[in-house]
Amino acid sequence: MHPEPSEPATGGAAELDCAQEPGVEESAGDHGSAGRGGCKEEINDPKEICVGSSDTSYHSQQKQSGDNGSGGHFAHPREDREDRGPRMTKSSLQKLCKQHKLYITPALNDTLYLHFKGFDRIENLEEYTGLRCLWLQSNGIQKIENLEAQTELRCLFLQMNLLRKIENLEPLQKLDALNLSNNYIKTIENLSCLPVLNTLQMAHNHLETVEDIQHLQECLRLCVLDLSHNKLSDPEILSILESMPDLRVLNLMGNPVIRQIPNYRRTVTVRLKHLTYLDDRPVFPKDRACAEAWARGGYAAEKEERQQWESRERKKITDSIEALAMIKQRAEERKRQRESQERGEMTSSDDGENVPASAEGKEEPPGDRETRQKMELFVKESFEAKDELCPEKPSGEEPPVEAKREDGGPEPEGTLPAETLLLSSPVEVKGEDGDGEPEGTLPAEAPPPPPPVEVKGEDGDQEPEGTLPAETLLLSPPVKVKGEDGDREPEGTLPAEAPPPPPLGAAREEPTPQAVATEGVFVTELDGTRTEDLETIRLETKETFCIDDLPDLEDDDETGKSLEDQNMCFPKIEVISSLSDDSDPELDYTSLPVLENLPTDTLSNIFAVSKDTSKAARVPFTDIFKKEAKRDLEIRKQDTKSPRPLIQELSDEDPSGQLLMPPTCQRDAAPLTSSGDRDSDFLAASSPVPTESAATPPETCVGVAQPSQALPTWDLTAFPAPKAS
């Protein structure tokens, strides 16, 4: 195939043999039918042209030249090729459309990129009727022509060409932007035919005088004008620019006229009333106001106007900040109102529940109130559990531990097992109101008790302030808790524990208690003047203590450990299930867990069974109860066939009317590995067995652990397993 006219031939021989083709096409373009027939002959037999002998090629060239009447035109085809640039042919335009992924059909394209192609002439654009943007910059175009078919054109880019005159733009009635920068234009002309021309760029041309730009007065719609880097030097050009009603953007940089106009920016801003952008920066309203003030009164007026503008700007900023602060303040007020409403609702709901914290009527802090409520709940549940576990005793019996009221009214009596106290003496709980409180008898197995300790509180509606925690009362005198108000909840006895753990929940330091000797007992009293500084201490135990942690009282000198180094725990009760269904259902319970959290748990948390059987327990005064223990063992051996409960009621009495001492649990001689070790942690403190008969009251095999010599234990494996209830 023959090469395109715009593509240079490559190869030495091929270039010499086929050099006549450009001449053929050119003649065809210049001479219609004759050249067109010659071209068809060459196309039909290309091999003869390119492969044939040099004589045949020469004759063909002579024949073409004879037909065209130009005798020496093809004598030097390579030189002619170098003189002329690429042409804007239809085939080359189609190739460019394909290269830029445009439509092959010319009329469908609205944009055509013909920049940087080296074209020197605008031609063959008749079929591109739908063009809206035509890029022709950076070519060698010398004349604006052949644009009659581009009636829809909006943007025409002809910068960086060889144009010397503005012409042939009449068909472009919809042209909006025209770029003629970097050309050789000396006069602006022939633009009045463009009714909607908005942007004209004439930078880097040869405009010099006022007459060269005088035609701009006829461009009434021109808004953006770029005349930078020309040779304009006459200040009278401002009169031409003033006559342009819609001029908004003006660029005069690079012209000598800038140096010829005094106060150039102020002057241009004042004279061009609608100018918003001058040269390289905008014209702000403040700049225009200052320029107008300068035109009226000079620099002083300009300074005053500038200060006014600055004050207005500062005031505007201040107003904005104040508005934001007001919005924030209103939001905070609404938040405070919501919070106050919520607090008011909470206060109204708590008015009936709040109790004064002191005798003076001061309100109790929230933490103290919560502690007091938990302590009252604990004491109440303690007495309820005592009433459920202990039956009433017949009247007339004098219990060693009593709970009395100061009004002396009749009170029901009840008993608690001896396991509720650990190495402590009877505890007396007294109140001042007239309500009858249940009177409980708490037998003790420990040696003779020391004097009791009494803790008084001055507020009847709350727990006595300055209450000492149970951990500080190990082997201490009994605690007497007295109330002075009739609204006082029933209070119970708190077992004593070792002193090492600090009191939990204490918020302030307690005042030093005073020991007062009254009636042969030691009473701990608190200074009444500092009652408001006292605080009820929550009796909480974070750790679970076992019976193995009890101190060895008799071996204290041998071991060298003080009682303060031993960790004590609350007494625990283990109840062995009955042998048959004849046992008392009220006493047929498994075990009571250890007291872990006084404010929240019930009295059942006081008692628990230790899982550690590493140490052997023993009870002092074994010689005293040895006889009764042997008798109990004989009775059990004689009456093994008769099933009966293992726990005896504490209310049983001796016929003489005196309370019998509890027997010890005699173990077999053979040591037990499992049940024996587990039961060795406790020894029962219960009533003696009355008679040897089948209908004997239940016996007990529950005891309080004492650090002493190991004792023989019962063989608990001989009893059958308890039946499921």
Swiss-Prot record:
Q: Which UniProt keywords apply?
A: Cell projection, Ciliopathy, Cilium, Cytoplasm, Cytoskeleton, Disease variant, Kartagener syndrome, Leucine-rich repeat, Phosphoprotein, Primary ciliary dyskinesia, Repeat
- CC annotations in GO: axoneme; cytoplasm; extracellular region; spindle pole
Biased region (Polar residues) positions are 53-67
Q: Which residues carry this modification: Phosphoserine?
A: S358, S562, S583
Which residue pairs form cystines in this protein? none
Q: Which residues carry this modification: Phosphothreonine?
A: T559
What GO terms are given for molecular function?
dynein complex binding
Instruction: Write out the biased-composition intervals (Basic and acidic residues).
Output: 38-48, 76-86, 330-345, 360-408, 481-491, 632-642
Domain LRRCT residue range list: 256-294
* UniProt xrefs under InterPro entries: Cilia_flagella_integrity (IPR050576), Leu-rich_rpt (IPR001611), LRR_dom_sf (IPR032675)
* Region Disordered, residue ranges: 1-91, 330-513, 632-703
Q: In which tissues is it expressed?
A: Mainly expressed in trachea and testis.
Q: Where are the LRR repeats?
A: 107-129, 130-151, 152-173, 174-195, 196-217, 221-242
Biological process according to GO? axonemal dynein complex assembly; axoneme assembly; cilium assembly; cilium movement; determination of digestive tract left/right asymmetry; determination of liver left/right asymmetry; determination of pancreatic left/right asymmetry; epithelial cilium movement involved in determination of left/right asymmetry
Tell where it localizes.
Answer: Cell projection, Cilium; Cytoplasm; Cytoplasm, Cytoskeleton, Spindle pole
Q: Per the similarity annotation, which family is this?
A: Belongs to the DNAAF1 family.
- Using the UniProt entry, name the condition the protein is associated with: Ciliary dyskinesia, primary, 13: A disorder characterized by abnormalities of motile cilia. Respiratory infections leading to chronic inflammation and bronchiectasis are recurrent, due to defects in the respiratory cilia; reduced fertility is often observed in male patients due to abnormalities of sperm tails. Half of the patients exhibit randomization of left-right body asymmetry and situs inversus, due to dysfunction of monocilia at the embryonic node. Primary ciliary dyskinesia associated with situs inversus is referred to as Kartagener syndrome.
Task: Relate the protein's function as given in its record.
Answer: Cilium-specific protein required for the stability of the ciliary architecture. Plays a role in cytoplasmic preassembly of dynein arms. Involved in regulation of microtubule-based cilia and actin-based brush border microvilli.
Q: Which named protein is this?
A: Dynein axonemal assembly factor 1
Tell me what organism the protein belongs to: Homo sapiens
Q: Source organism lineage?
A: Eukaryota, Metazoa, Chordata, Craniata, Vertebrata
